[in-house]
Design a protein with these regions (language model features):
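Nucleotide/phosphate-binding catalytic cleft detector across ATP-hydrolyzing
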Residues: 1-10, 21-25, 31-124, 132-186
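Loop/turn residues immediately N-terminal
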Residues: 12-15, 125-127
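Small-residue-rich
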Residues: 17-19
Length: 186
């Protein structure tokens, strides 16, 4: 059975779990320019061969030379589009660092013990409020991250779906980018 490598795509880097220490190591592509509201990995397309080379070399430092036997288990931002998911899969598979890719949005990976919850996350372009029931996304609402009011978002989260109006469901702040301090007081 193939071994998996856990990874998280954040707002500006890729976190890869080190097999020895169990800690996440950060891969940041050199010379990428931060562009508002555009995920950093979009720039990989401009220099795809170079980015794949640097990524493969980085992976060799953590997992050695036989990379193609692994499956990447990647947690992606909640606002990742289907087209972006395809690009992410192709980028990793074609970099000869894995044999397959499995993706899951952050909201679905956030909580394993609760059957119903609301996730609030902030990507490089959106704030995403998502109602999750039985480990599936039921309703998702997007807000512009530059103009959204945390008070409005928290109020909307409580009435995102009819289930939420009649029973108490926990709200989790998905703070993997460490950029949601204004929500932590709720």
């Amino acid at each position: 059975m193939a071994k998996t490598i856990p990874m998280i795509i954040t707002n500006n880097s890729i976190l890869i779990k080190d097999k020895e220490s169990g800690e996440f190591k950060t891969f940041t592509m050199p010379a990428l320019i931060e562009t508002p509201n555009i995920p950093f990995y979009h720039q990989f397309a401009e220099k795809i061969a170079e980015c794949q080379y640097y990524f493969k070399e980085f992976m060799k430092t953590i997992y050695g030379k036989k990379l193609s036997k692994y499956i990447f288990a990647i947690i992606v931002p909640d606002d990742t589009s289907r087209l972006e998911s395809i690009f992410i899969n192709e980028f990793f598979v074609n970099s000869d660092t894995c044999k397959a890719v499995a993706q899951m949005p952050m909201a679905l990976a956030l909580q394993k013990d609760e059957n119903k919850y609301v996730s609030i996350s902030k990507s490089s372009r959106n704030i995403v409020v998502e109602y999750v029931r039985n480990h599936e996304s039921v309703v998702t609402k997007y807000y512009d991250m530059t103009t959204a009011d945390p008070n409005v978002i928290m109020a909307d989260a409580a009435k995102l779906h009819i289930d939420l109006e009649y029973e108490s469901v926990p709200i989790f702040i998905n703070n993997y980018n460490m950029n949601m301090d204004e929500y932590l007081s709720f």
